[in-house]
Curated annotation (Swiss-Prot):
Alphabetic keyword roster: Heme, Iron, Membrane, Metal-binding, Monooxygenase, Oxidoreductase, Transmembrane, Transmembrane helix
UniProt function note: Gibberellin 20-oxidase; part of the gene cluster that mediates the biosynthesis of gibberellins (GAs), diterpenoids that may provide a selective advantage during infection of the preferred host plant, rice. Gibberellins (GAs) are diterpenoids and are synthesized via the mevalonate pathway. Biosynthesis of the major metabolite GA3 (gibberellic acid) from geranylgeranyl diphosphate (GGPP) requires 13 steps.
Enzyme Commission number, as recorded: 1.-.-.-
Cofactors, names only: heme
Pathway(s): Plant hormone biosynthesis; gibberellin biosynthesis
GO terms of biological process kind: gibberellin biosynthetic process; secondary metabolic process
Membrane topology category: Single-pass membrane protein
Protein name, as recorded: Cytochrome P450 monooygenase 2
Organism: Gibberella fujikuroi (strain CBS 195.34 / IMI 58289 / NRRL A-6831) (Bakanae and foot rot disease fungus)
């Protein structure tokens, strides 16, 4: 499909002939020129899926969305043990993981159209004060004692965590964001500032941001009024233990409060945390549904530790089999088929002699997760894999769910590894504790369990049918602990 047809298919009769003429005679040649120059960057590295012609990469991009696993597998066989554009072999993971010249935030902002209305959330990742990273590392991790509460309770407090309008936004915004981002990426970068106005998914993002402002802003104003009243009365300032308060504190401490948008911050938390946490929880349930013989040992571990120690962070840490089962599900189905997304901010020469030019984009291949040289029988789900690894000398730390390394980059690797992984890991454990103790489940016969891979992103199957029922008798009353 040509660029012209792509635009008109979205815009239909709304696109006036005047704008069509401008588009055809000015933007199309401009887009072709810049798309071709972009392809030629870093051409010393072989291109795994070259375009069919000079007149755009739309067909190639759409093909990659549907066939990314196949294209990646072909590239591995064509270029064994060497980089191919723009995905490096995993041998370079440790070398590049903490290099400050390789920017994760710039790569994320470029991929997800920072600066285009509706995509404001991705710009938060690139803030110089690292606001969202600080809140994730310092505050979410510190407040694991209330992990049994759902994410919205921690993020927004008790006033909004049950707000149906907000919960709807948190569920739909992430889906709409990635759909809009993927569809907009089908267009050459040079015309995306125009194309987004005609994409229905982008319109949804702009509307959801407007709706979120209407929900969150009144709450923030009420809190500020309470603080002003407390100051006037000479009383202590009220404290709210949620991400709204934490983010404002961090922004003020960094001296960036004036540029801080609390609504965008909340949408970004939802974007970065909720869907990934849900996906790993769902994949773990699917894997255990396929292997129900492992459910009872996990249940026994949970019941024993909670009965002896109650709900504490140390209790969750001691659930080593549960930790291993989740990490094994992440190994078999990571959230992305590649990891360590980076943008090169200045020329870099790797130890192999390969030079990465400024402006180059790269990712690291995630194939070590199913490499038989690293893991025995990698195609087999074994929830004891990392549990047993903990007893091996020098491997205890690396076998933990939250640990990162070049052999398991489910949460990334290096200084840009997921800052909220400690929070997410414990949130998933608490959810599974409740599910294991209170419910039995199994997969429906012949249900589909194959992951849904779109481009780089791999999601747990959205069509898997799970039969679940409440257990008639339970070993422990979790609410009474």
């Amino acid at each position: 499909m040509s660029i012209f047809n792509m635009i008109t298919s979205y815009a239909g009769s709304q696109l006036l002939p005047f704008y069509i003429a401008i588009f055809v005679f000015t933007l199309v040649p401009w887009a072709i020129r810049f798309s071709w120059l972009e392809l030629r960057k870093g051409s010393v590295v072989p291109l795994a899926n070259p375009p069919d012609s000079l007149f755009g990469t739309g067909k190639t991009r759409r093909s990659f969305v549907k066939l990314s696993r196949e294209i990646l597998a072909k590239a591995r066989s064509l270029f064994p043990n060497e980089p191919f554009r723009l995905i490096t072999d995993w041998d370079f993971a440790d070398e590049i993981r903490n290099d400050p010249r390789l920017s994760f935030s710039k790569a994320a902002m470029q991929d997800n159209h920072a600066g285009i209305p509706g995509f404001e959330t991705v710009a938060l990742v690139g803030r110089e004060d690292q606001l969202i990273q600080k809140v994730a590392r310092k505050q979410l991790t510190k407040h694991l004692y209330i992990i049994a509460r759902i994410s919205s309770r921690i993020y927004l407090g008790d006033q909004l965590c049950r707000n149906e309008a907000w919960l709807k936004i948190t569920k739909t915004y992430t889906t709409n964001f990635y759909t809009a981002s993927t569809n907009l990426r089908m267009f050459p970068r040079s015309i995306r500032p125009l194309a987004h106005w005609f994409l229905p998914e982008c319109r949804k993002l702009r509307q959801e941001r407007k709706d979120a402002i209407g929900i969150i802003t009144p709450l923030i104003e009420r809190r500020r009024e309470l603080r002003r009243a407390a100051i006037a009365a000479g009383q202590p300032l009220p404290v709210f233990h949620d991400a709204i308060d934490w983010s404002e504190q961090e922004a003020e401490a960094a001296g960036t409060g004036a540029s801080f948008d609390p609504v965008i911050f909340q949408l970004t938390l939802s974007l970065l945390a909720i869907h990934t946490t849900y996906d790993l929880l769902q994949q773990t349930m699917i894997d255990l549904g396929r292997h129900p013989e492992y459910i009872e040992p996990l249940r026994q571990e949970v019941v024993q530790l909670l009965r002896e120690e109650g709900w504490k962070k140390t209790t969750l840490f001691k659930m080593k089999l549960l930790d291993s089962a989740i990490k094994e599900s992440q190994r078999m189905k990571p959230g992305s088929i590649v990891t360590m997304r980076r943008y090169v901010t200045e020329d870099i020469t790797l130890s192999s002699g390969l030079t990465l030019k400024k402006g180059t984009r790269l990712n690291v291949d995630n194939r070590r997760l199913d490499d038989p040289k690293i893991y025995d029988n990698p195609e087999v789900y074994n929830p004891y894999r990392f549990y047993d690894m903990r007893s091996e000398a020098g491997k205890d730390h690396g076998a933990q769910l939250v640990s990162t390394g070049s052999n398991h980059m489910g949460f990334g690797h290096g200084q840009h590894s997921c800052p909220g992984r400690f929070f997410a890991a414990n949130e998933i454990k608490v959810a599974l504790c409740h599910i294991l103790v209170k419910y039995d489940w199994k997969l429906c016969p012949d249900t589909e369990t194959k992951p849904d891979t779109r481009g780089m992103i791999a999601k747990s199957s959205p069509v898997t049918d799970i039969l679940i029922k409440r257990r008639e008798s339970v070993e422990l009353d979790l609410e009474a602990i």
